[in-house]
Amino acid sequence: MTQERKSESIVTINAKFSSFNFEKLNWRDRTTTVEEGRFVTHDTSGYGRLADETDLIAYVNFLVSSAPSVQDFQSDPFDPTSPVQALEGGGLSGVQGGGIELAIPLARWYVAASPANDPAVGKHVTIAPGAAPAADHGKPAAVAAPAAGLISFGVITKIRGDTIFFMYNSIGTQY
């Protein structure tokens, strides 16, 4: 008998299944959980970690962090050499995108004190700066004009209510 786990997420993926994949990240710290909607990546040892503004490759955590079974979702070990890995179990499932549309509620975005950094249509999506409070690490952030060295993971295409939609690429563009 196989056991099945299901997840809901605040992250909305607006794409055909054939246009994206999920990247499995084995989370080293099995005592804390990661909110969905945060950018995650691999560390140099192959484990998952919160991404920062210097990472060129980043995935969006899809697994719901408020589910009663979140420890099962994020803390179960998985075998990265296995040819079959269920989406529902073992580590984090990061959305791996190449020009797909994602939507993340505004409450999950990093918003600096300046209104110039508020998400708006046409702004670039980056990762909260390292100087941001630790509680904001890995959150998506918006910038109007890419400065030299900035890594952009997409552009905001629309805002509906409190939900921010953007075209997402897991391989960032560095300016």
Question: Which residue ranges define each predicted feature?
Answer:
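Surface-exposed, low-hydrophobicity beta-strand/loop segments enriched in small/polar/acidic residues
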Residues: 1-175
